[in-house]
């Protein structure tokens, strides 16, 4: 995935956050390891995969060559972070099952936190993914609506025509 690719090129370390490893559908969310069963069925050598790590794991200092090329201090550390919806939940202060976060962007996503592993059969039958959260033993699920960004664009184009025109005249975005 993109995260571990970037981390590897910046540090030489192959690691990936649990929440992003989950996006491969080949990650066992119970054991927090790659699923040998899936890799064997697909005839893929699991050793080619980056090591799954908790969100916030330090991959170490940036390689001197990378630091020089992109203008960062060679003392800069590279940290594996999470899927954007997990980051949104953390940023919104959602740390237990009493609340959820609703993020709108390319998609709209409601992200509730579960204080323990939810019933996987119920979740999977509803087409919800279950993802390890930043707090050990907690999980999140993603309830996606793929019209998120498209709906916002439709509203701007249809309901905010005048505002869009005024923003264009002012040389700014209607979203500012």
Per-region residue spans from a language model:
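Active-site core segments that coordinate phosphate-bearing ligands/cofactors
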Residues: 1-2, 7-15, 20, 25-36, ...
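Extracytoplasmic/periplasmic/luminal assembly and interaction segments
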Residues: 61
């Amino acid at each position: 995935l993109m995260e571990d690719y970037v981390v590897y090129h910046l540090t030489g370390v192959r690691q990936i956050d649990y929440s992003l490893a989950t996006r491969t559908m080949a990650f066992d969310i119970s054991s927090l390891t790659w699923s040998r069963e899936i890799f064997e069925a697909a005839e893929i050598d699991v050793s080619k995969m980056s090591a799954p790590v908790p969100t916030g794991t330090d991959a170490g200092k940036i390689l001197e060559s990378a630091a020089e090329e992109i203008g960062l201090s060679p003392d800069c550390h590279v940290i594996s972070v999470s899927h954007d919806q997990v980051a949104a939940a953390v940023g919104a202060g959602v740390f237990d099952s009493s609340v959820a976060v609703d993020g709108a962007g390319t998609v709209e996503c409601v992200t509730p936190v579960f204080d323990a592993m939810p019933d996987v059969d119920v979740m999977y039958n509803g087409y919800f993914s279950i993802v390890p959260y930043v707090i050990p033993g907690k999980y999140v699920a993603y309830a996606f609506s793929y019209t998120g960004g498209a709906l916002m664009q439709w509203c701007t184009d249809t309901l905010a025509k005048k505002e869009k025109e005024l923003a264009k005249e002012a040389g700014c975005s209607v979203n500012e």
